[in-house]
Amino acid sequence: MSGYLLFKSLHLIAVISWMAGLLYLPRIFVYHVENFEKDQATEIFETMERKLYNYIMRPAMILSWLFGIILIWINGIESFTYLWLQLKILSVVILTIYHEYLGKCMRSLKSKENSKSSRFFRIINEIPTVLLIFIVFIVVFKPM
């Protein structure tokens, strides 16, 4: 097996894991906000959020970046000249900012300082879906 295919496979596994977390964590926030007055439920949601964020999402994000950088290195630095790759990297930067924003939301929920509604979390839950669709199409078709 070539190194490129190995790292491409590892990159895909990490990205799928990261995306699963990015799609699921806001959904937990919805339930958390809707059950904010129930102490036992709140405690369960806080544990779920913390474990998902720290044990799955953060490592998956780091590995997605690491394996992606390795793939660029294997392909050669000149691959940075491809517009499709620049757009993909920009999209991944946006996903990373979104990831960190979810961490901020998680901390505000835990400290009872959250001002966001469950509807807000339902809406922002679509951000990674839109970016995922965009990334898949530009990577598969490499239009530019």
Language model features with spans:
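Polytopic transmembrane helical bundles with strong interfacial aromatic enrichment
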Residues: 1-144
